[in-house]
Amino acid sequence: MVSQMFGYIVVNQSEMKFKEYDVYRSYYCGLCQSLKERYGVLGQLSLNYDMTFILMLLTGLYEPEDPFEKHQIRRNLFTDYVADMTVLFACYKAEDDWEDEHSLKGLAYSYLLGKKCRKKPLLYADKVRSISLAMQDFVDAEKQGDADIDTMAQIVSCREDEWKDNLERLGFFLGKFIYLMDAYEDVEQDIKKGTYNPLKKRYEEPGFEEECRQILTMMMSECCKEFEQLPILQNVDILRNILYSGVWCRYEIVREKREKDSVNEVTGNDL
């Protein structure tokens, strides 16, 4: 259950200005273009909004020039880096799909995308190595049935500078939020399938929904605390829209659906 980058870190479009959304989409399109150039159509399949946030975060912090900037597409020196990290995570996700569910689609995607990765120069050898070790440790913990929801961390920082610690802590809590949101959304399905989910043991307990909300809120609170320590001005309103509002959009959809299903089940039993 390697649950990284599933589209939980999104904007709340209803609370954005049209111009802000156009800027957001331009970074998304720039990342899409980079993925296609570097990895082809297979790479484009890994495109997601979570990594678009990372791209905008790094851009806002370091304010690089945009040599490829157009009205609808924005690219800078971080775009290719984020594209490479996107593909790396996609490979792990595909491998995990094969391990968990024997998904032939996951196996094929991992193999084909992995071939493209191996053909490219290894520009981030140390980072790839550290991520690989972290992900393997996590997979090993899952195989042992370790339901400790504090085992997930992710690396967001890309430079050895004064902001490295803040970025790593931000990425740590953001990664845990994504992981727990995925677990929260999939818990019923994972119980039926018998696949690993760190929330399985708690699902039938009283107060499950409230406990999940509290934990998720705590993760995002810590994430936002680290974010606010960064000297970001560029597109800061878009980034705050994501961190303070957008991340809860999917949660509310899942919670409301589960609540509705529960009511329907009770009503059906009463008939």
Which functions belong to the PLM regions below?
Residues 1-169, 176, 180-209, 213-217, ...:
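Acidic catalytic motifs of isoprenoid enzymes
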Residues 238-244:
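Short, electropositive alpha-helical surface patch
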